[in-house]
Amino acid sequence: MMAPPMTPRELRSHLPALSGFTWLNAAASSPTPQPVFDAMNRFLRDTLERGDVGYPSWAKAKDETRAHLARFLNCTPSELAFTQSTSFGFHVIGQLLKQRGITEVLTLECEFPSTTLPLLFDGLTLRGVRLRPDGTAPIEDFEAALTKHTGAIAVSAVQFGTGLRVDLHAISKLCHSRDLAFIVNAAQGIGHVPLDVTALHADFLAATSHKWLMAGYGTGMLFVKKAWLESTQLPFGGWLSVEPSEQFQSWVHATRTDDAHGFTATGTKFRTEASALEAGGGSWVGLVALDAALTLHEAVGVANTLAHAQSLQTLLRTELRKRGFVPTTPDARETLSGICVVPVQGAPMDAVRALLREEKVSTTARAGGLRISTHVYNEEEDVLRLLSAIDRLGIRPAGV
């Protein structure tokens, strides 16, 4: 018999930081849950007391974490690489797109730079779809913006500066009908909204650990669809990019030869699993944290997380509107995420954020407004404390 899902209140009890702060800032970062900290601490204590004697068990744990993430995203472990950031993942994606002859990528004009700048640095041309005045981006606007040169569409599952939850399935269908690569920036999505890369027919997905995932800073995740791994060359390599039996050869006299299946070096081919993109050693403690965080998310259920965040957003937006604030995206359930951004009158947004921080309320200044995030660990009292602080500090909506 399956255990009942962990409730938001039960999860909240695992975050000691919430006893001293009203944390409405998951879109920037989340506090570390106690089980995640404990897992990291056990690993670090082991290295303190035994050095790297436990290395074989670390390697096994890395494989288990990769398999855990694969279940979470509904893909195979061989399609996943661990990186240090979403931006690094998008650099890899840009290089693989270029190998396929793709030169132009369509995205939203309001995309976060971890989507756009890596692709620009990789030499790709970007075209942007502008949000409508109501803050939405209907699929027909994407379709109208396509050109004969467009080879891919890249979007964030949730927009960082507005909170718009993009219709990924509609974009996926458009990509499939036009033979375009489909790329998802999941930095604001993973651990926040359900993501199934198989159901989405995604070609790539890149994400990070420290926001909604609650796994601390420093670990990135990259999904590369198997077909891309088998038909493109590694954009770079390292000792972990070759078979284990060849990892300790010097290769000093090797020569590189390109063929249809990838690079060869004196008869040796690089691996075609996504993990070959890791090239070298990474953050073991970050992977330990990721595995523990995934366990928490599975205990709650990501669909339950989104529903809880939306419920708090409904309360928040209703009360903000009573005070004259206007969120930059609609309240409709189909586009609603755990992010709300409202323009504020007067002082720079960073100053408003700082005033709230003095009240022990954590928010963020983004896209010219105050960004308020509701996550699974939040409760109605958090929203009410924010509203009380807004009233007490005399923070007013823009245009009033």
Model regions: which residues?
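Pyridoxal 5′-phosphate
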Residues: 1-400
